[in-house]
A protein has these predicted regions:
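A generic local structural motif
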Residues: 3-6, 62-66, 121-122
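C-terminal "cap" of GNAT-fold acetyltransferases
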Residues: 100-143
Length: 143
């Protein structure tokens, strides 16, 4: 389901949310919320087992990750995706550029995380020749 190195999964396990099937407790879907800055996070690695797609499980994962972002005080959530329509249903909108102030950008440059490097669109990261779309959601404060 995921094409990530096992070490990466262990490093990021606390960021993940998973959905299990009731009948046999097997993994049905996953997704991660990676906080990049005090008010900015990325939704990463949303995946649903192929025979469980179309059942709303992926949407439930994203809803849970957005709820976690709100609890943490995150106000902007970013994703880099091919599933534009899927994320648009959650309010994400396509963006261009990097939506952070210059001083935050310079701090983020210190990160070793490849996802942060992709967010910053750094030259050392593979160019976006596949057509991924950068999307952003501005979260409203809870009432």
């Amino acid at each position: 389901m995921l094409s990530k190195a096992t070490v990466t999964l262990y490093e990021d396990v606390q960021e993940f949310c998973v959905a299990e099937l009731v009948d046999d407790a097997s993994l049905a879907a996953c997704g991660a919320l990676h906080v990049m800055w005090e008010d900015l996070a990325e939704i990463r690695t949303v995946a649903v087992v192929p025979d469980r797609q179309g059942l709303g499980i992926g949407h439930a994962i994203v809803d849970e990750l957005l709820a976690r972002a709100r609890v943490l005080g995150v106000r902007r959530v970013f994703c880099l995706t091919f599933a534009v329509d899927f994320f648009a249903r959650h309010g994400f909108q396509p963006i261009s550029g990097t939506p952070v102030a210059a001083e935050v950008y310079s701090e983020l440059l210190r990160s070793y995380d490849e996802g942060v490097a992709e967010f910053l669109d750094l030259e050392r990261v593979k160019p976006n020749t596949l057509g991924n779309t950068r999307m952003l959601l501005r979260l409203l404060p809870e009432r």
